[in-house]
């Protein structure tokens, strides 16, 4: 078998392969012999059909099958021989497939980039440290209470944080517009759910009162037909309800699946959850900085096939997450290209770090991570057992642990600065990660 390879770009390869005619004919004859054993042709007993008849009837199909199989087999042999690592399926261009001649074809494909991870010493990481103070715990309990607020009807004027039940009709230039009217809408004043001026116009209103509120749609309003236009809303207030925060009692604790009947026990459970979230937030911020540093220090080209596959994965995820009657391929590629490129590049870099430093998932760290996740459940031992009985779930944890080991490896060489901050600052969502260049 003859093989020649041309580098048509940094990652693209144009491989010409010639398979000897003898091998081609052997493959064709093998298929014809198999066909002869099962062929049913009038006038002949099964298995006794002359080969000349078999060739007349089936040689074209046998040759086509042989072509497909030989292309696949010889391509694999060629990339092994040439020590190439394709990043996707090849585009095949037949050149010669005549009877009695060598099978010749061209395979065009991309290879994975070859590189060594560098610049670890140039990476700078700020590692935060924080504690859950009593004041942080108090604030969290108030947040939990507010999340479970109920509303009771009152006979007074509405104020911010009250919930009003309203009917409204909106008009622009004296004409009602689509989506501008509703009945029985529940609205918490001050929530910012409606356009500016709408909620403010209801402060001081009482049940049974009708108000006319004049507003202007924002210039960046999603409905371009309404953006920047003045509107008049006629609003009828059906009822006004005041917020009532729940008491910190056993019934409230039970809503969170916590069996504790005392405030002290509940606070301890909430603190434990906050500390777990704090550890995860700090770990995530460190990881993001490490990954950003790896990206900046290792600019590499991305095979188009990998990028396309990742874009398609993100499209499918978007449809699954947001629903709607839309097919993934209808979503614009541009929406996902930046994220897809970052994920692909990081995937290649992380894989190279694993290879370069000969990393393997640490079983003790795998167990530690599973125990950490299980601690959030009422029956942690059952959760731990479930993970170890499910290979897919266990392998996912092993992958996460391996990625953490990559981060730890980088941190050993990077410049790390420790900084003490408040709980609120530590758990505050990080800024969007940098894109791959």
Swiss-Prot record:
Residue intervals of the PPIase FKBP-type domain: 161-246
Molecular function in Gene Ontology: peptidyl-prolyl cis-trans isomerase activity; protein folding chaperone; ribosome binding
Keywords: Cell cycle, Cell division, Chaperone, Cytoplasm, Isomerase, Rotamase
Example GO BP: chaperone-mediated protein folding
EC number: 5.2.1.8
SUPFAM superfamilies noted in UniProt: FKBP-like (SSF54534), Triger factor/SurA peptide-binding domain-like (SSF109998), Trigger factor ribosome-binding domain (SSF102735)
Reactions it catalyzes: [protein]-peptidylproline (omega=180) = [protein]-peptidylproline (omega=0)
Pfam families attached to this UniProt entry: FKBP_C, Trigger_C, Trigger_N
Subcellular location: Cytoplasm
Main location: cytoplasm
Entry's Gene Ontology cellular component terms: cytoplasm
EC primary class: isomerase
Family indicated by similarity: Belongs to the FKBP-type PPIase family. Tig subfamily.
PANTHER family hit by this protein: TRIGGER FACTOR CHAPERONE AND PEPTIDYL-PROLYL CIS/TRANS ISOMERASE, TRIGGER FACTOR-LIKE PROTEIN TIG, CHLOROPLASTIC
Domain text: Consists of 3 domains; the N-terminus binds the ribosome, the middle domain has PPIase activity, while the C-terminus has intrinsic chaperone activity on its own.
Role: Involved in protein export. Acts as a chaperone by maintaining the newly synthesized protein in an open conformation. Functions as a peptidyl-prolyl cis-trans isomerase.
This protein's name: Trigger factor
Upper lineage: Bacteria, Pseudomonadati, Pseudomonadota, Gammaproteobacteria, Pseudomonadales
């Amino acid at each position: 078998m003859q093989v020649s390879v041309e580098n048509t770009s940094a990652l693209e390869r144009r491989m010409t392969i010639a398979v000897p005619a003898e091998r081609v004919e052997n493959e064709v004859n093998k298929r014809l012999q198999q066909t002869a054993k099962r062929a049913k042709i009038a006038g002949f007993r099964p298995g006794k059909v002359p080969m000349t008849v078999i060739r007349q009837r089936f040689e074209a199909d046998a040759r086509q099958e042989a072509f497909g199989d030989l292309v696949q087999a010889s391509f694999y042999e060629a990339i092994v021989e040439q020590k190439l690592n394709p990043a996707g399926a090849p585009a095949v261009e037949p050149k010669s497939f005549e009877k009695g001649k060598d099978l010749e074809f061209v395979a065009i494909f991309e290879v994975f980039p070859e590189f060594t991870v560098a610049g670890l010493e140039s990476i700078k990481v700020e590692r935060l440290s924080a504690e859950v103070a009593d004041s942080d715990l108090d604030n969290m309990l108030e947040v939990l209470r507010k999340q479970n607020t109920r509303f009771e009807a009152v006979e007074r004027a509405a104020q911010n944080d009250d919930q009003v039940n309203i009917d409204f009709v909106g008009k622009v230039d004296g004409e009602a517009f689509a989506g501008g009217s509703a009945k029985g809408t529940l609205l918490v004043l001050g929530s910012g759910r409606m356009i500016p001026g709408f909620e403010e116009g209801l402060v001081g209103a009482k049940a049974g009162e009708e108000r006319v509120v004049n507003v202007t749609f924002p210039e960046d309003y999603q409905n371009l037909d309404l953006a920047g236009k003045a509107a008049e809303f006629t609003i009828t207030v059906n009822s006004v309800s005041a917020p009532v925060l729940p008491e910190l009692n056993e019934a409230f604790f039970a809503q969170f699946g916590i069996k504790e009947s005392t405030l002290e026990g509940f606070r301890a459970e909430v603190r434990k959850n906050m500390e777990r979230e704090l550890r995860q937030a700090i770990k995530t911020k460190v990881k993001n900085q490490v990954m950003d540093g790896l990206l900046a220090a290792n600019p590499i080209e991305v095979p188009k096939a990998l990028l396309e596959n990742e874009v398609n994965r993100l499209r499918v995820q978007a449809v699954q997450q947001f629903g709607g009657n839309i097919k993934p391929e209808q979503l614009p590629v541009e929406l996902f290209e930046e994220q897809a490129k970052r994920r692909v590049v990081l995937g290649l870099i992380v894989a190279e770090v694993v290879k370069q430093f000969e990393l393997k998932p640490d079983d003790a760290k795998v167990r530690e991570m599973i125990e950490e996740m299980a601690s959030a459940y009422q029956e942690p031992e059952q959760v731990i057992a479930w993970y170890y009985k499910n290979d897919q779930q266990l392998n996912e944890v092993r992958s996460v642990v391996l990625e953490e080991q990559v981060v730890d490896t980088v941190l050993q060489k990077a410049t790390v600065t420790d900084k003490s901050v408040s709980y609120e600052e530590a758990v505050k969502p990080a800024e969007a990660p940098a894109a791959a260049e």
